């Protein structure tokens, strides 16, 4: 049996295959969000109306990458986003900037940041800890909980989970 769900508040409502019936709390949140922001009630509407990007701290390739990802999100082309940059070009900073934008303005609740080596997980965590937001200069980690995925799991309040591909695979396989 297939179950489909249509969120009538989406900018282009359409039936989507779902694997679980939404919980009453989830449906209540959808209604609250629509009432609180009728012009941008869903994350799909929010990513189509993101505020202008503060380009001052960014390099041209980073600006192009962020604009490209946001264009893909707005067009709902989730399988067509790839950031490819040279070593040292600021991929992690670009991803942290994008993470901040979609958490603050895009209606995203959580982000999984995958790396292929443990030392990259540590570097990524440091990049999130050092990132200063463009609007008020606060550190990313003052606003959002960022943590590396461990054997113990994550707190429910974690907004950005950093993990190696191997750890995620192990968690899926065991869980």
Language-model segments: what does each one mean?
Residues 9, 137, 148-151:
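Long, compositionally biased, helix-prone stretches
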Residues 113-115:
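Short beta-strand-centered segment that lines the nucleotide-binding/catalytic pocket of NTP-utilizing
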Residues 170-172:
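Short, solvent-exposed loop/turn elements at domain surfaces
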Residues 145-161:
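Conserved motor-coupling elements within RecA-like helicase/translocase cores
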Residues 120, 141-150, 168:
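Short acidic loop-to-helix transition motifs that present clustered carboxylates
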């Amino acid at each position: 049996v297939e179950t489909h769900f249509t969120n009538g508040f989406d900018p282009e409502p359409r039936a989507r295959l779902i694997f679980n019936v939404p919980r009453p709390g989830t449906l209540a949140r959808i209604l609250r969000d629509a009432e609180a922001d009728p012009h941008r009630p869903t994350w799909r509407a929010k990513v189509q109306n993101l505020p202008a990007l503060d380009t001052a701290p960014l390099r041209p390739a980073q600006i192009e990458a962020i604009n490209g990802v946001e264009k893909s999100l707005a067009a709902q082309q989730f399988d067509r986003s790839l950031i490819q940059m040279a070593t040292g070009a600021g991929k992690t900073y670009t991803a942290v900037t994008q993470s901040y934008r979609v958490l603050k303005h895009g209606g995203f609740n959580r982000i999984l940041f995958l790396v292929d080596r443990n030392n990259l997980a540590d570097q990524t965590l440091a990049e999130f800890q050092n990132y200063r937001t463009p609007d008020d200069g606060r550190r990313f980690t003052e606003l959002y909980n960022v943590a590396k995925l461990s054997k113990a799991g994550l707190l429910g309040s974690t907004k950005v989970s950093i993990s190696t591909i191997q750890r995620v695979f192990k968690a899926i396989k065991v869980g």
